[in-house]
Amino acid sequence: MAIGFICSSPDAELFSEKSRMSSSVLLGCLLCCMDWSAAVPGKTEPFRKLFDAIMIKKLKSCSAAYPSDLDEGSMCDMADASPTSLELGLSKLDKES
């Protein structure tokens, strides 16, 4: 499922750096981001689009922040991927609806 999401994402260049990136690191980053979905159950399609955009952004910053760790397959530190960004996005969605 995670690989399917990445391959089908509008940002397919995530895989263009495949030689640099360990799939376990990428999967680890994705799973950290996906934990957010449990915080806000039952949201609609606009929420999923926002959520996907946040995930892609976090994956890119994760791969950029830890280039030396990627070959070793270590887990990215996603502590800064707090629900704050998600909450800001959700409040924007609430205002639009």
Curated annotation (Swiss-Prot):
Q: Please list the coiled coil stretches.
A: none
Q: According to the UniProt record, which cysteines are disulfide-bonded?
A: C32-C62, C33-C76
What is a GO molecular function of this protein? cytokine activity
Q: Which UniProt keywords apply?
A: Cytokine, Disulfide bond, Signal
An annotated GO cellular component of this protein is: extracellular space
Keyword Membrane attached = no
Fetch the InterPro entries from UniProt: Putative_chemo_U83 (IPR035347)
Q: What domain of life is recorded for the organism? A: Viruses
- Keyword Thylakoid annotated: no
Which family does the record claim for this protein? Belongs to the intercrine beta (chemokine CC) family. Highly divergent.
- Designated name of the protein: Putative CC-type chemokine U83
